[in-house]
Each structure stands twice: as structure tokens, then as C-alpha cells.
Amino acid sequence: MGTEAEQPSPPSPPAQQQEQTNPPLWNAQNQKPARLYRLVLFFIAGSLAAWTIHALSNSNLVWKLRQLHHLPTAHYLQTRDEFAVYSVEELNAFKEIYDKSVSDSVGASYTKDEQTSINEALVSLRMAQDMYLAGKDDKASRLFEHALALAPRHPEVLLRYGEFLEHSQRNIVLADQYYFQALTISPSNSEALANRQRTADVVQTLDERRLQSLDSKRDALSAIHESNGALRRAKKEAYFQHIYHSVGIEGNTMTLAQTRSILETRMAVDGKSIDEHNEILGMDLAMKYINASLVQKIDITIKDILELHRRVLGHVDPIEGGEFRRNQVYVGGHVPPGPGDLALLMQRFERWLNSEHSSTLHPVNYAALAHYKLVHIHPFIDGNGRTSRLLMNTLLMRAGYPPVIIPKQQRNKYYHFLKLANEGDIRPFVRFIADCTEKTLDLYLWATSDLPQQIPMLIQTESEAGERLAQMQSPNVAQRSSILEFYESGSGALP
């Protein structure tokens, strides 16, 4: 019987080949630690990358939030309205970090000097309340003002001073402003919230009444025929006044007489810089452009604003005139948007200017908001204030109002109200523009009346003009009486 033959075994590979086929034991054992090291390094690198992206994202939000600190998102502040320069979607994206920043700022520690001022302010506040309860309102008022000067952003000081103004001084408008500021700083302050809920509707009604009274004066001025000699003289004088005060707000030292001389004769004034001359000539060019073109236009475009600015800086800086800035700028405590955001923000501003919603606003409110929006964006390297005031007056003129004169004597108030708008409350700035509008209307109505007195704006002595303007800053007795009767009635309805 045959058997299956055994297969010969394959020849053994050479020793060198066998070493390559079967690597040393120590190399195979070290593959697992090496693989583990790579995984750990990959995990660490991924974690660092994720943390870096998160940090950059948060830092970007914080940087943008610093620009948005004046745009409160809490509904009870009642200021999420047409003045915001960012969209609702963008504000919602910042809400979480905004709330965190508010809580952080409320609990922030103070420096030694700041804490000393706050302690002194609180002592003054307690003394003021004692004086008020004792019926010594004058002393109480001075102590409240001292406390506010020491701690202008302390919620308790703002709240108690507001209550004093509301109940003792019957100044509900200013009281409501302080309640608002207290809420902006401390959104959870229940007393400030309750006070504001009580005063908000009354103040809104008072503001509406004020705007209606401006319409009545505007209509009275419109009834005067253009051929009226006194009206023509008043317009000419107001033209000089407008340019003089607008450049004066920015620091121009020309007197009213010198400004008039430059505009009428085109002759240089001794002892004054070329730039000061050119600022006046630039305003003259811009005013003529408005009268010849913009007043008749239905819509105001970015190109129109650039053309306006080009004339404002045409003699001072023709290279930058009519061009958006290319650098970051800083205006006091306000940090305007970066140059990379200007194109988008100006496009939104243009849409808002010509929107159907804006057309429903009162002309003074609309013009003041446009002024604030543009000066907040701060699109130019220089001339933002002058251009914003010119745009404001363009919108007012289209609604039948004369160009508003903001007196240079009111420069500090003007900037103060812009600062309050940056902090969240646009209403004081709108009221300030309404005050200036009323004074300008009074200028024309007084000039065209049969009254023998000169009006404050037309007095040739500038010190007299400033003194008379200061007197007009406060409402007269009849106006105060009307406001008090309305508020004390408690009805909240117009009489």
C-alpha cells in the first residue's frame, strides 16, 4: 500500500531577512506607548485650539460689547427703539455676555479713592434725606447735588435724588432720567423699576406735548410770506449765527462779527489761523449745497452725506473730505466702530433714514436721532459733529422747520446729552434739540413780530446773547404751572 509522501519543508530564510521579517521584541512593545503619546498630543493640541477659538470669540464679543454698552436689551428700560445702530439679531447675540458684564460691573471692586468718594457721597445722601424730611429743601438740594457729583453712577444716589426731584421739586422729567440711569447700572433695582413704571407714561406724554407745541410755532412761521422784509433779515442773520455757533462748538475762536465779515467779504481776519478761516468757508459751502440740492430730495443717500462732508472739509483737508476714515478713532470715553464696520453701518443708517418707520417719527425726534446715529458711527476722521448737525438741519428743513442753532455757550450740555445717549437714554438729547429748535423758532417769530425788543440770537454783543440764552434755557412760570397741573391731576391724559 502506498502512502502519501511527506512534503519537504521550505528553506529557512537567511538570518538578515529573518531579522527584517520579525523585528526585535523591544520595538514591537514600544509601538503602543508611541501611539498613546500621539493621541495625547493630538488631544492637547485640539483642546488648545478649541480654547483659543473660544477665547478669541469671547474677546471679540467683549470688544463689540464695549461699543454696545449704551444699547440696553432689557425690555423694562423701554429704549430698544429706532436710535440703535445695530440690528436686533446682533443685540440678541450679545445678550448673554451683556448680562454677565452687567453683573460683573455691579460687583466690581472700587479703588481706594473711588470708595472714599462713594462713602462721602452716601454720607451726603443721608444728610440730604434728613434735610428733606425736616422741610429744608434748599439745603437738601445742595447735598443731593454734592452726592451726585461724588458718585454720579451710584444707583442709590441716582434713585434718591430722583425721588427728591419728583416729589419736592416736581421735576418728573429729570427724576425719570435718573431712575433710568439707576436701572441701566443696576437692572435688578426693584425700587428704580417701580418708580420708572410710574413716571414713564407721564414723561412720554409731556414729551409729545412739547413736540406738538413746536409744530404750532412752525406753522405760525410758515404763515409768514417769504417777501416779508423782517423774515429775510432774520434768515440772513440766522445763517451767520448757525455757522458761527457750529464751528464754535468745535473750538473755532472766531467772533460772530469776524465770521460775518469772512462770509460777506471773503477777506482774511488778522491773528486767526488759516484752518479757522477754512472751517467757516467749508460750512458756507455745505449750507449752500443743502439749500440747492438736499432739501428738495426725497431720499438722503450715503453719497449725499459724503458730498456734504466733502464740502465741510473741502478747504481744511481736501484729501479726507468725503472719505470714510481708515483708522480707529477715540472720542472721549466713546470708542466708535472700527473702520471695517463703517460701510455696513452706513448702509443700515441709509436704510433707516429712508425707511417708512422713520417717516412716521416727529421731525424733531427724527432729526435728533439721525444726528445721534451719525455722530455715534463717527464715519469720518474729522468733521463728524458739523456733518451730523448739517444732516439734522437738512431733515428739519424738509419738514418746514428752520435750521436749528445749537449755541456754542451750550457746548458742555450738548456733549453731556450725547454722552447720556451713549449710556442708553437718548431722550435728554432729543429734548435738548427740541429746546434749541424752540429758541430758533422764537428767533424768527420775534423778529417778524411788532415787538420792539431784540431777540437773544440777534443781539450783537455776544455776552448779552449768551446771558439771554441761559435765561431761556429754563421754562417760564406759565410753562411750569402747566406741567405741574398736568402731573398733579394724576390722570395721565392731555387737558
UniProtKB/Swiss-Prot annotation:
Membrane association type: Single-pass membrane protein
MF terms (GO), sorted A to Z: AMPylase activity; ATP binding; Hsp70 protein binding; protein adenylylhydrolase activity; protein homodimerization activity
Hydrolase listed as a keyword: yes
Organism: Drosophila yakuba
Lineage: Eukaryota, Metazoa, Ecdysozoa, Arthropoda, Hexapoda
Annotated protein name in UniProt: Protein adenylyltransferase Fic
Family: Belongs to the fic family.
Catalyses which reaction(s): L-tyrosyl-[protein] + ATP = O-(5'-adenylyl)-L-tyrosyl-[protein] + diphosphate; L-threonyl-[protein] + ATP = 3-O-(5'-adenylyl)-L-threonyl-[protein] + diphosphate; 3-O-(5'-adenylyl)-L-threonyl-[protein] + H2O = L-threonyl-[protein] + AMP + H(+)
Residues that span the membrane, as ranges: 36-55
Keywords: ATP-binding, Hydrolase, Membrane, Nucleotide-binding, Nucleotidyltransferase, Repeat, TPR repeat, Transferase, Transmembrane, Transmembrane helix
